[in-house]
Amino acid sequence: MCIRDRIDIKKLIAYSSVSHMGYVMLGISAGGYLSIEGAIIQMINHGITAGALFMLVGFLYERRHTRNISSFGGIKITMPRYAAIFLFTSFASIGLPGLNGFVGEFMILMGSFNSYKVLTSIAAFGVVLAAIYMLWAYQRIFTGPISNEKNESLKDLDIRETLSIVPLVLLMLFIGIYPSYIESFVIQEAGFISETIALFKDIK
């Protein structure tokens, strides 16, 4: 699974992005209204969470000029605000209920099960795997004692960085609590795509 101590944090997020797009493809291929609506919402939510994660990795790279997991450890001691936001964003990425990542994934799984029972079951197991490797990475980077003296002088997020990431964090929370708001924007498109797929199936 390409998970090693010296793995690049940015690559880990990229692998996670591929996983999220797999859910999107499952939802679209199922062709149902609910699964397609979930796929559209998943793409929107993925843009928010992945964008935030890449920003956070960029902030860390500016300070240490490395993205290898083995170069870190215990940095929540010196960067508590950064650690809290990274954990929150990781929870959103793996689909914790109450955050934006849960909405699309749940709709895709529910809408795809009747069409692809086996694939949907595998996808549901993938949610667990995603949680494992994201939390594994968090543990290696942030928890425990500081394992590298270069990390002892790391500065926490400044005002500019905080203001740039907070809007994305608020979106993760808002969409997770009020999913109906974003559903109102995609409901028409989801219906059109679902009807088009059904039409092609009938022609076939």
Predicted segments, located by residue:
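Short, small-residue-biased leader/transition segments that mark boundaries at the very start
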Residues: 1-3
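Membrane-water interface at transmembrane helix exits
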Residues: 5, 58-62, 110, 139, ...
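Helix-loop interface residues and adjacent transmembrane-helix termini in multi-pass membrane transporters
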Residues: 6, 33, 37, 63-66
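Divalent metal-coordination and catalytic microenvironments
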Residues: 8, 18, 46, 72, ...
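Interfacial and helix-entry/exit segments of alpha-helical transmembrane bundles
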Residues: 14-19, 24, 49-130, 152-171
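Helix-coil boundary and interhelical linker segments in multi-pass alpha-helical membrane proteins
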Residues: 24-44, 111-119
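Membrane-interface helix termini and inter-helical loops of multi-pass transporters
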Residues: 34, 38, 103-111, 183-191
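Cytoplasmic/organellar membrane-interface segments at the starts of transmembrane helices
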Residues: 79-81, 134-204
